[in-house]
């Protein structure tokens, strides 16, 4: 089988490629990635040079290049991780998010139609549902929750989801969609909360927390997410949406304090900064459907997963030190350097 993984040099995509190689050693894997700031070719070093692995530096919006890859490789399945995914960046400049997340997805699905009605899986986010109140812990996102986006990022992902559903209904494309809660684990770019706090704490730098840090997120270890996607791709019902959640709800401030404790760093490093515009209060996913239909449940408790993640960043300093030494510093200064205190 030939599998296309778009966005495979990014955090979740790379972990998914490693998962596939471990479980399907004879399959041909083709990684398609534009190598934006969040894509890192060094992450894929264990796969590069393998005879049944190909890396293609291609923008999914480049129709000619995408069609050329389909012509060469004739994939059996496409799993689309390729996306601009950081909410703050989408607020600063929505245009790239609309282009990559919507137009890029349509180009991929057009290629799937053109080259044999290829199986297509769209990786999405719980952010398409909006947010939940902090005082109603009984409320969870289900697959029936209406789409109610809060940011240009989540709006672009919701549009891509709707487009995928439309391609399934209009053209008969075999499509599935998964929507996950917040991921964490190895190889995550340090603009996201957990790796940002780990990297800053290790350097004794301020730990910027939006508002008072009371926003709640449901945390999903990336390995559990990869296993869930594999089940949906292989056994999910065509045309269906599957929510993937970690059953690990935590306030942002509690995560930051936990990281400080595990690294032996003082909480005085925590710096409260002005809140994000339209900051969602709480995300929490009900994974009952994927459990009932496919037998999936998260296996990684947050206490174990965060320890594993911290250990990885401690053991792989060269990977993240290279990232934080370049263009990222300019972005970091723009996002946090001039932000007023909360």
Predicted regions, residues:
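C-terminal substrate-binding subdomain of Rossmann-fold SDR/epimerase-dehydratase oxidoreductases
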Residues: 3-4, 58, 195, 201-342
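A glycine/serine/threonine-rich, flexible loop-to-helix segment
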Residues: 47, 135-136, 190-198, 274
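Short aromatic-enriched loop/helix-cap "lid" or pocket-rim segments at secondary-structure transitions
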Residues: 41-44, 132-135, 188-191, 255-256, ...
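N-terminal Rossmann-like NAD(P)+-binding domain of SDR-like oxidoreductases, especially those catalyzing
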Residues: 1-183, 308, 313-316, 322, ...
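Active-site helix-initiating loop/hinge in glycosyltransferases
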Residues: 185, 189, 218-221
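Hydrophobic alpha-helix immediately C-terminal to the catalytic Tyr-X-X-X-Lys motif of short-chain
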Residues: 159, 163, 167, 197, ...
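Short histidine/acidic/glycine/proline-rich micro-motifs that form metal-
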Residues: 35, 182-185, 215-216, 276-277
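Residues that form or flank phosphate/diphosphate-binding pockets in enzymes
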Residues: 12, 38-39, 64, 188, ...
């Amino acid at each position: 089988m030939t599998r296309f993984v778009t966005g495979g040099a990014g955090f979740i995509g790379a972990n998914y490629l490693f998962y596939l190689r471990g479980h399907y050693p004879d399959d041909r894997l083709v990684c398609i990635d534009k190598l934006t700031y969040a894509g890192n070719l060094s992450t894929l070093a264990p796969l590069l040079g393998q005879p049944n692995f190909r890396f293609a530096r291609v923008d999914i919006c480049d129709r000619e290049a995408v069609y050329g890859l389909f012509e060469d490789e004739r994939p059996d399945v496409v799993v689309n991780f390729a996306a601009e995914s950081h909410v703050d960046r989408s607020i600063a400049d929505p245009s790239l998010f609309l282009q990559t997340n919507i137009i890029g997805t349509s180009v991929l699905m057009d290629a799937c139609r053109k080259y044999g009605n290829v199986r297509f899986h769209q990786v999405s986010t719980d952010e398409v549902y909006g947010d939940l109140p902090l005082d109603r812990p009984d409320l969870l996102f289900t697959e029936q929750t209406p789409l109610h986006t809060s940011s240009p990022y989540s709006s672009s992902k919701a549009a891509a989801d709707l487009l995928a559903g439309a391609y399934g209904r209009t053209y008969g494309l075999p499509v599935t969609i998964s929507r996950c809660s917040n991921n964490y684990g190895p190889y995550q770019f340090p603009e996201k909360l957990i790796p940002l706090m780990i990297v800053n704490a290790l350097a004794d730098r301020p730990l910027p927390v939006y508002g008072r840090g009371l926003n709640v997120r449901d945390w999903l270890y990336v390995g559990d997410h990869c296993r869930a996607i594999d089940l949906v791709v292989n056994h999910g019902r065509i045309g269906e949406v599957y929510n993937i959640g970690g059953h690990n709800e935590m306030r942002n401030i509690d995560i930051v304090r936990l990281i400080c404790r595990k690294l032996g760093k003082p909480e005085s490093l925590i710096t409260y900064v002005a809140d994000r515009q339209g900051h969602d209060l709480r995300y929490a996913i009900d994974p009952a459907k994927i459990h009932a239909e496919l037998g999936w449940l998260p296996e990684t408790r947050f206490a174990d997963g965060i320890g594993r993640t911290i250990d990885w960043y401690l053991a792989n300093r060269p990977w993240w030190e290279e990232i934080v030494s370049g263009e990222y510093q300019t972005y970091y200064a723009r996002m946090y350097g001039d932000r007023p205190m909360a």
